Amino acid sequence: MNKTDLLNSIIRIDENRLLFNYTMFKTIIHPDIYMDLIQLIFQQNDTILQTNAMYDVVVDFKGLTMTGVERYKGFIIALSDEGQRNGKNFLQKLGKITIVNPPFMVANVGKILLPLMDKSVKEKIILG
């Protein structure tokens, strides 16, 4: 499998949704390819927005642990920085974020933080 195929196994398009597979992410990702994956995410997002006004994100967190959160913090920061840099208003065009198989910690943190969030943001997050 080449690098493009590997990256496409982490994140793919399904209609107007970006589907993120953490199980594949953790087996493939390395700091050397963070920007390749981030570029793919934004390319796929652009593809969706060519035919849809909004997009959704589905994240399958099966197997995520606190160690994993700490290990991939650099990727999350790089993704956030690039999103702010590109100025394409992706957050305004985001419909819903569905979190599938949330680990215990995510579900519990979500229960604490969701009541404190702005209603417009809170309505976009679905813990399932």
Where are the model-predicted features located?
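SEC14/CRAL-TRIO lipid-binding/transfer domains and related phosphoinositide-recognition modules
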Residues: 1-96, 100-128
